């Protein structure tokens, strides 16, 4: 990852710029003014990734990051104020552990994953095979730091403790527990994610029909939204995310969700009866009374066929990490659906990136 520019004094102006940019992109569709959900100014990022950089002429190593497009000029990191307090507390303690050759030899990358609930997992990546000597040293370190550890080298992965962290998020007075796996996507800004879940929960409202969810990930939105509808059909293509979502549904006793490992494009084919899928053999698609669809697509947005699929629903709840592709998708749907609510979630302070949400309702 590249190092964001950290300047809390500039936060308000940067957020205003994002608000203006989103409002401008949605203006052709007569969107209401966006609701704004701010981020904490510091210690908001729950994960961080650092390369290790060795000083020329000695063995001293540092956490390092690079400006985008420049992989040769390191920015040496002693602390990282945008990262969670837990990450900042762990950084020097982990650095001291590099003195043990069993842990430090040919270590080239470190990844931290933490939660608002206080859990932490550290992944150590090596340019050498790791073995039982590494495991023994890692078990001691994990106990000292109170973390889970994962070691990675070519073709090998050793887990000390758990290979996931445990998160708790509160939505509308109910607490939901999440397993967030190492290496899988999770929302980086926990406080803003919690606000985003609350907005989506409120925007959907209480319904007596069913919800289709595309790109469900580890069930981040699935859990609270499932309490708003009769039942949910959710899709996700990543195997690790599917497994995490199934565990999260079970841990929270959410029993009205069916989850299938299909891409959005494949589900479109299934709903249009273009072709059958074995993974849908136990699911009766005709038993669903879909009135709502929730989408949280990748940066490329929805492909035209998937976008066309969403047109058949009364309500389209759309979370986007790219406002440009969001606007492109809305342009395709604008003749049948209007924007009734929109929001800006500042997941990524001090960068140009933004998360946004819209509720589209049939005209």
Swiss-Prot record:
Gene3D superfamilies (UniProt xref): 2.40.50.1070, Vaccinia Virus protein VP39
Gene Ontology MF term list: rRNA binding; tRNA (uracil(54)-C5)-methyltransferase activity, S-adenosyl methionine-dependent; tRNA binding
EC category name: transferase
Entry EC no(s): 2.1.1.-, 2.1.1.35
Catalytic activities: uridine(54) in tRNA + S-adenosyl-L-methionine = 5-methyluridine(54) in tRNA + S-adenosyl-L-homocysteine + H(+); uridine(341) in tmRNA + S-adenosyl-L-methionine = 5-methyluridine(341) in tmRNA + S-adenosyl-L-homocysteine + H(+)
Purpose: Dual-specificity methyltransferase that catalyzes the formation of 5-methyluridine at position 54 (m5U54) in all tRNAs, and that of position 341 (m5U341) in tmRNA (transfer-mRNA).
Family to which this protein belongs: Belongs to the class I-like SAM-binding methyltransferase superfamily. RNA M5U methyltransferase family. TrmA subfamily.
Full protein name: tRNA/tmRNA (uracil-C(5))-methyltransferase
Protein's organism: Pseudomonas aeruginosa (strain UCBPP-PA14)
Gene: trmA
């Amino acid at each position: 990852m590249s190092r964001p520019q950290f300047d809390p004094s500039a936060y308000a102006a940067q957020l205003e710029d994002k608000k203006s940019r989103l409002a401008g992109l949605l203006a052709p569709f007569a969107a209401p003014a966006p609701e704004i959900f701010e981020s904490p100014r510091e210690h908001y990022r729950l994960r961080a990734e650092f390369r290790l950089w060795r000083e020329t002429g000695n063995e001293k190593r540092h956490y390092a990051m690079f400006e985008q497009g420049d992989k040769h000029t390191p920015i040496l990191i002693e602390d990282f104020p945008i990262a969670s307090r837990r990450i900042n507390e762990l950084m020097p303690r982990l650095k001291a552990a590099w003195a043990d050759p069993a842990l430090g030899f040919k270590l080239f990358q470190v990844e931290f994953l933490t939660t608002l609930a206080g859990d932490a997992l550290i992944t150590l990546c090596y340019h050498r095979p790791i073995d039982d000597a590494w495991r023994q040293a890692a078990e001691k370190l994990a106990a000292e730091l109170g973390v889970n550890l994962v070691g990675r080298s070519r073709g090998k992965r050793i887990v000390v403790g758990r290979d996931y962290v445990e998160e708790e998020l509160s939505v509308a007075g109910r607490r939901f527990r999440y397993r967030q796996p190492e290496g899988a996507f999770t929302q980086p800004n926990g406080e803003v994610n919690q606000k985003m879940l609350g907005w989506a929960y409120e925007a959907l409202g209480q319904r007596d029909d069913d919800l289709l969810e595309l790109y469900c990930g580890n069930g981040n939105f699935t859990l609270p939204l499932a309490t708003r509808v009769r039942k949910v059909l959710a899709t996700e293509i990543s195997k690790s995310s599917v497994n995490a979502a199934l565990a999260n549904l079970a841990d929270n006793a959410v029993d009205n969700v069916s989850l299938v490992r299909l891409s959005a494009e494949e589900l479109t084919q299934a709903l249009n009866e273009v072709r059958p899928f074995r993974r849908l053999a136990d699911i009766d698609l005709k038993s669903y009374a879909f009135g709502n669809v929730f989408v949280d697509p990748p940066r490329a947005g929805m492909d035209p066929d998937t976008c066309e699929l969403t047109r058949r629903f009364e309500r389209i709840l759309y979370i986007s990490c790219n406002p440009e592709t969001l606007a492109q998708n809305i342009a395709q749907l604008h003749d049948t659906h209007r924007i009734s609510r929109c929001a800006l979630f500042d997941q990524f302070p001090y960068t140009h990136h933004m998360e946004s949400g819209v509720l589209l309702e049939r005209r």
